Amino acid sequence: NYGFQNYFNQHTYLRELAEGLFPDNVYERVKRLQEEPRYSFEHMDKRKRSLQQYAEDFRTVYNKAWAKFTGVKPIERAHALALMNSLRPIIDQRLMYFAYYDGKPIGFYLMIPDLNGVIAPLKGHFGAWDKLRFLWRLKVSRKATRIFALIFGVIPEFQGKGIESGMIYNFEQQVNTPHLKRYKSLELAWIGDFNPLMMRMVETLVCAKKHKMHTTYRYLFDREKPFTRAPKMTVKKD
């Protein structure tokens, strides 16, 4: 192996989109959330809220759920809006989920169509005509059949209450509607083994299974220096 050693593994998880895949305890937890009117789950709908408001809801949750981890920085309002604007051409509103408690954002689960099947026929070309073909295949003929999960998060005080399951459950209720029935599976990629909390959440709350694994190797030119694997993600101390 020429001295290269396993620095970290990144897992890709896959989940088929069909009702009845959650274990009973998850359904019971989701049912309790549904019976509490202070909780609400909704997909992006720009008739209800502006893109700017969704960007701010995303920023609010991200900075509470993710920015406390080592190596993760909080994001500013302008950055969050720029991220949403960059996704605008490929957004399917019914794949962008938010959770609220008393109308305040407590979680998000952001997904987009997997573009691999949409882009492949373009054969690497992306001129003006190819862009039109791309949009036609994505928005009109709807060639994407797999969903790619970008990121999800729940603010700390609501973690462990099934909010993640509540969002994906509400999404799955729409899978068989005419707009979404073309989607058959959900992929969650690049989840490192240095983040065991995320792996556990994906396996127990999203109920996805490991599908692929990519390994990053490291070589130390200083052969006297002890090798250590990537440090685990931990919460920053105040």
Which sequence ranges carry the predicted segments?
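Active-site/acyl-donor-binding loops of N-acyltransferases
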Residues: 1, 5-20, 94-97, 101, ...
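Exposed alpha-helical structural elements
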Residues: 25, 79-82, 197
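Short alpha-helix boundary/capping motifs
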Residues: 27-28, 86-90, 207, 229-231
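Acyltransferase donor/substrate-recognition loop-hinge adjacent to the catalytic core
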Residues: 2-70
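A conserved beta-strand-loop-helix scaffold within acyl/acetyltransferase catalytic domains
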Residues: 40-154
